[in-house]
Amino acid sequence: MEHQENENNQFTNDFSIQKERKVKLGENISNDNSLLLSQKANKSVCEVIRKDGYGSGFFCKVIFENNEINCLFTNNHVITEEMLSKKDENIEIKINNQIYKIALNINRRIWTDSELDFTCIEIIEKDNLLSIIDPFEIDKNSYNIEFELENYDRKGIVITSIGQNKNIELGYGAILYVKNTEDRFLHDCNTVEGFSGGPILLMSNIRLIGIHCGYEKENKKNLGIYFKKILEYIEKKTIKISIEIESNEKKEDIRIFNQNEDNKEEIKDNVKVYLNNKKVKLINNGDQWKINYDFKKDGIYELKIVFTRNISNTSGLFEKCNIISIDLSNFDTSKVNNMGYMFNGCNKLKEIKGLNKINTSNVIDMGVMFQNCSNLEYLDLTYFDTSKVNNMEYLFFSCNKLKKIKGLNKLNTSNVNNMNSMFQKCSNLEYLDLSNFDTSKVKDMGLMFSYCNNLKEIEGINIINTSNVINMNGIFQQCTNLEDLDVSNFDTSKVNDMGYMFSRCEKLKEIKGINKLNTSNVTIMKSMFQKCSNIEYLDLSNFDTSKVNDISFMFNCCDKLKKIKGLNKLNTSNVNNMNSMFQNCSNLEYLDLSNFDTSKVKDMGLMFSYCNKLKEIEGINKFNTSNVLNMKAMFQHCNNFENLDLSSFDTSKVSDMDFMFNDCNKVREIKGISQFKANELVNTYSMFQDCSSLEYLDLSNFNTSKVTNMSNMFNECYELKEIKGINKMNTSNVTNLRGMFQKCSNLEYLDLSNFDTSKVNDMAFMFNKCLKLKEIKGIQKFKTSNVVNMKAMFQECKKLEYLDLSKFDISKVDDLSFMLYSCKSLKELNLKNFKAKKDSNKVNLIAFISDKCHLILE
């Protein structure tokens, strides 16, 4: 088989041209070494069988890393990269009309290069060829053909074994041109179809100098590949990379690879970089290797990195390097044990060629290998040998353009113990086949598929072995396109963390097998089902939560959830956090928490907030809240409650009650509120806001000495007629009273005689639209020296008849607008000593006063 190229290239297998040269095979050359050579060639040369023809090959001993190995040599166009990639197939050769098979699924060294046009396959004992073949032997140190040809007979010969039942064929001629700096040389040895891949030797000393590869049209001569160049290629571990130089980028000191503590001695003095076959200056800067080159213009440049010594550790080798493509086809990684961080942060990398050829048989660590390769769309791991790998954490993390990982289903993961964040943020993956994953040793699956937003199917997830897994935190978090999930076979007996496990699986309608999960060792269930917004039913009847300490956000935003079976059986004796546990469960109507032990709970903030349809919480009246610190927005927007019995609530340690009952607009009574002591209370902002059906509040036991914010505390309590204990409230630390009683349109009387307002800076809207308010006792004692805003403070207090503001210090007030707007019933207004910061403010203030009002100014 001759080399086939298009008409623009120098090679051809146009046999009509060769026939014009009157090729004569098997001429009598008995005066030289042809007889001896023919006998040797019976065991040294073979036919390479192809589906579409045949070519030649030969066996040769070469020295590789101080070891002698036997190899089969031929052309790359005879044994192609495509043929080599089919590991389940064999390379077939014929020796003395006997067919032999070379298996590709066995670990062996293989080199191939389409530019140099050669393929070299190591022959090993399992091939059963070593006792049959008689390889050529070479001395790699004596090659200097360019000069030696002057001293030798330049007669050469090409040997082949071709065709059905044919013997060894010899094609002889002259070696015309050899130069040490070039890959190819010219010869006119007689050849026909099938000679490609045959050895070229000097007849004078039976010396191997090359491989026949084709025909040059221009000179009408045959071409040989200089064997010295092939040996150099094999000896040098070459990586090809492409970098892109942009106009706004510094064109000097460009980082192209890195070293680490384990490989710096292997790299030192053993690496060279070439651009257009010219050596480029290398600069070592700590762990970074850079090139110093004056690029004349922007564009893409291909560099060759040549390692003259094997590297055992490629950890971080190209981390954060400005590479757009890389070719590892000829990089020998047979001794590498660590590939962690190898391409981490290569965010311009679009292509990794030859990844399916690298030897990973000794690799132990692949953690973070492709992390943040955010421009990669495809990876071929078909022939990755991961049998020794124990770490795959963050392997593909944030490869957010990655659409396909070929060969994933064939990875040997039998020794892997860490898969944390393995596919996290692979937001373009739609399908994963893990059907052959052996996860029997895996301990960590935390965040394994998290943020795979387009993932629709994980084949094999129902059969993976999780018997040793300890961490499942966020394993399926934000898999927003998963519709089905079967965890029936999950063995979770050792798992201690299930936080965020199914969080934001927004299309998931059912989690098959959830009732079978063994949770006996789980301590964290935070956000476990958060925003599973399509799930209507959960069966937790077999959940053992005796060790769980955090169930905050557990069902948060499950807005279609109608029933949670087994909730009343959950053991919460060790739980300390229930923050937002049922928040936004807007379809739940009933909760049975009668067996909840809340004695250790510290946080109940937002626990039932926005449960819009919730009508009853059985057992809420038995809650032990003696250790609770936070009740912020606990019942916010529970606007279907009519009654709340909190008679068992101990609030002595609670510091935050902001929004606690906000928008509970059907609640008429909060039983037990009178017992609230709240000795540590700091915030009551909007605590009862929009409790629009509440008629009575007894806050006589409230200790508000530490409270700083009471703004909107009773805002929009339209039906509120009495606030018992308001006259005893300690407001000495309050800074904000904005809107505190706003729209309390049924309040007729307020006794604020004990209010200490010395630290208050905002009183805007404080009594705004208290439509029935007739008297505010103690208003004349207010200390307002720090207040800056009194906007609309008494606006539309339409029943207010007397106001004494003579002690008001408004020297710092910036806004008095609408302060007394529409106070239509005012009979007397005392503004004596009322000195506004701006006269215009005072003018505007009294402009709205009725003519019937007795105005005291001096």
Q: What is the role of each PLM region?
A:
Residues 1-10:
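PEST-like, low-complexity acidic/proline-rich intrinsically disordered segments
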Residues 11-62, 72, 118-119:
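N-terminal activation segment of mature serine protease catalytic domains
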Residues 40-54, 68-69, 73-184, 202-204, ...:
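Serine endopeptidase catalytic core focused on the charge-relay Asp
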Residues 58, 176, 190-213:
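Catalytic nucleophile loop of clan PA
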Residues 63-69, 181, 202-207, 218-219, ...:
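Short, solvent-exposed loop/turn segments that connect beta-strands within catalytic domains
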Residues 75-78, 161-165, 193, 210-218:
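Short beta->alpha transition motifs characteristic of CBS
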Residues 208, 212-237:
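C-terminal cap/linker of serine protease catalytic domains
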Residues 238-858:
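Negatively charged
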